[in-house]
Amino acid sequence: MQIKFLTTLATVLTSVAAMGDLAFNLGVKNDDGTCKDVSTFEGDLDFLKSHSKIIKTYAVSDCNTLQNLGPAAEAEGFQIQLGIWPNDDAHFEAEKEALQNYLPKISVSTIKIFLVGSEALYREDLTASELASKINDIKGLVKGIKGKNGKSYSSVPVGTVDSWDVLVDGASKPAIDAADVVYSNSFSYWQKNSQANASYSLFDDVMQALQTLQTAKGSTDIEFWVGETGWPTDGSSYGDSVPSVENAADQWQKGICALRAWGINVAVYEAFDEAWKPDTSGTSSVEKHWGVWQSDKTLKYSIDCKFN
């Protein structure tokens, strides 16, 4: 099994030569549930910049995210993987209005990618054809918007993010075809994996998604990101998955660092704990505890990759 896995891995990653990039998913609310302002975002980014200068978000209009985060990211030299929430028409229209209002106030280079939807297919909020239509809608919209220096956002790719298992399902193909870039989410915790199997499961999920996308795009030379992955440090167990600082540290080294060593770009979920979230999602009480740092910016475990 290991020989077969390594052979498949080598085939999928033939074009990879360098360490994969690191990004962090970033929450937009304070511990008390209020929305972060420009100065708070600047503080977050100033703290993160020694580790990464790429952040990922989920919506444009919610909490005035682009209005406040855009200027902060530009001031701190960050790029945003900017999420756009497409699931209902009213929300989608608010997202488009925010893009039109606030993209002109920042430089085009501040936006790394527009990501239409976050697991919209996994949750069955949209069909693949509906998501494809909204991806194309955003492509058309941003072509007509210019940044503060007069350059068009047409140069910025428009993609989507979804769970790895949905992406390998043939039903997702219309959305994959419409997207310039597709990010794949994978959480060994939510698959009830034991710690002994967690990193192997992560690699297998990611490679299946990458191979599917390479086949769909007709090339091994594609931009690819793991859009979310991580391990909770507290809360209840889920099957054989046990939240703890030790297990999160282990998954960082054996999963996240190892993926990056193979040249896979990873957006970690998430930078900071989000204390405002509910104690339980109805499945497991881990929602507050995914951060690499506590909400007060105390590091929980080493994130230096140790290849020894």
From Swiss-Prot:
Cross-referenced Pfam families = Glyco_hydro_17 (PF00332)
Give the residue range of the signal peptide. Answer: 1-18
Write out the catalysed reaction: Successive hydrolysis of beta-D-glucose units from the non-reducing ends of (1->3)-beta-D-glucans, releasing alpha-glucose
Compartments where located: Secreted, Cell wall
Question: For this UniProt entry, what is the primary localization, expressed as one broad class?
Answer: secreted
Q: Which residues form a coiled coil?
A: none
Q: Which family does it belong to?
A: Belongs to the glycosyl hydrolase 17 family.
Spell out the protein name for this chain.
Glucan 1,3-beta-glucosidase
Per the UniProt record, the lineage of the source organism begins with: Eukaryota, Fungi, Dikarya, Ascomycota, Saccharomycotina
Q: Which gene encodes it?
A: BGL2
